[in-house]
C-alpha cells in the first residue's frame, strides 16, 4: 500500500522528458479516514476540485499549446492523488504530441481515473475569481487564541436557539504537509442549517489546525466530521480553497447528501 512517505514529496526529482502516467502517485484514503474515526459508510459526499494553471503539450505539427484545466476527483474514490506527482505527470505532457485538445483531455481523465480508482472529470478552463465570495467572515472576532494544535473539536458547539441557515467563512485556515512540513493556506466555507454554531468556538477550532500536519483532503473531512458531531446541523457543507503550489491548487468539498442550495463554484482571490 502506498504511503505519503513513499511519494516524491520532499525529494529532488528530475522533470520527465516524456509522457509518463506512472508518475501519478495514489494514496489510499482509508488510513487518513481511520485517523479521523471515519469507518464504514461515509457521512458525506463530495469531490476534490483541482485547478491546473500550467498545462502544455505539442500539437500534431509540434507547436506548443497551453491551457488551464479543472479536475474533479470524487471523494468516494479509493485513493487521492498526491499533488507533486500530479504536477510531474502534467509536466510529462509538455513534449508529447496530440492530434487535438480533446485527445489531451481524454488522456488526462483516463490516467487520473485509473490511479484514483474512480471516474475523474476533466474540463479545460477555470472557475471565475470572486473577490467577495459567499457568506459572513468570522475572522474579525475579538478573541484571544493560544492553541494552535492539534485540532480541538471541544471548541465547537451550537447555541440553544432556533435553527438558522447561514454561510460562515474564514481565511485563517493553515495546516502543514505531513511529509515536508510546508505550510498549506486556505480559505474555508461552512454552509449549514441548524442551531447557530458558536462563532468564537468555530474560529478557535479552525486556528487549532495551524501546527497540524495532514493532507488538504483529510483536513476538510476532519472539519466536516467534527462540526457534524459537535454541532449536529440538519445538513452541512464544508469547502476549503487552498492557495496555489507548483501550478496547482486543490479545493476539497464535503457535503451532506441532501443540500437544497449548493455553494457557488469560484476561485478565491488568493488563488
UniProtKB/Swiss-Prot annotation:
Keywords of the record: Cytoplasm, NADP, Oxidoreductase, Queuosine biosynthesis
EC code: 1.7.1.13
Any single biological process term in GO: tRNA modification
Record localization: Cytoplasm
Enzymatic reactions: 7-aminomethyl-7-carbaguanine + 2 NADP(+) = 7-cyano-7-deazaguanine + 2 NADPH + 3 H(+)
Active site (catalytic residues): 177, 184
Pathway the protein acts in: tRNA modification; tRNA-queuosine biosynthesis
Chain coiled-coil ranges: none
Family according to the record: Belongs to the GTP cyclohydrolase I family. QueF type 2 subfamily.
Assembly and binders: Homodimer.
Name of the protein this chain belongs to: NADPH-dependent 7-cyano-7-deazaguanine reductase
Organism: Xanthomonas euvesicatoria pv. vesicatoria (strain 85-10)
